[in-house]
Amino acid sequence: MKEYNVGPNGAQIIAADLMALNIDEMKEIIESMESEYVIFDTPGQMELFVLRQSGKFLIETLGAEKSIIGFLYDPVISKTPTGLISLMLQAASVQVRFNVPFLNILTKTDMLQDEERDTILKWGANILDLEEAIQSEVPTLKSQLSIEFLTALRSFGASQNIIPVSSMYGSGMEDIYTTAQQIYFGGEDLSKG
């Protein structure tokens, strides 16, 4: 921030653009790793990655054909039906923008009660359960709009499993690995290639 004389938002934009400018060096480092896969976290809010050309450039340059995007679901927002639908809409937008395999990941599940986590996972796996939860609420403009969005998401095929993860408990990474195996190798162990 000091070097470029910008605030936090400007620094995040510059960080995203610097990643694109230094892509060859980053690609070299990634390719030199003795790892079957690399998790690549992008700076700042998703808008910096999704809505700027540098995000698409990063995926294309690093290899869209071997990329998977993990969309992170906030646990607090996901606890309500309308909150989850809002996140599903954002996820669908990212999926349309990049058109690569996609994982829905519920983060910080240690912040949720078991029942809350299970409800979110059930809603993600079955849109009809989510619609039922909305319809059980007092009808409002927000709930009606959510049902309309849900109809669009259903036609888009947005009903997908959500993978719960917790860094506090170290849970969920094996599920992400297994899902990546399913996507690219039909369940076989990942291999460099």
Predicted regions and their residues:
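Nucleotide-state-sensitive switch-loop elements of NTP-binding domains
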Residues: 1-57, 63-68
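Expand to "…catalyze enediolate/carbanion chemistry for C-C bond making/breaking, isomerization
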Residues: 17-20, 27-28, 84, 157, ...
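Core catalytic machinery and nucleic-acid-binding channels of phosphodiester-processing enzymes
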Residues: 33, 37-39, 68, 74-76, ...
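A short helix-to-beta-strand connector/capping loop
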Residues: 35, 156-161
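Phosphate-binding beta-loop-alpha motif at adenosine-nucleotide cofactor sites
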Residues: 40, 160-170
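Conserved catalytic-core segment of NTP-binding enzymes
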Residues: 47-155
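Interdomain boundary/hinge elements
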Residues: 132-136, 188-193
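Conserved GTPase G-domain signal focused on the G5
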Residues: 168-184
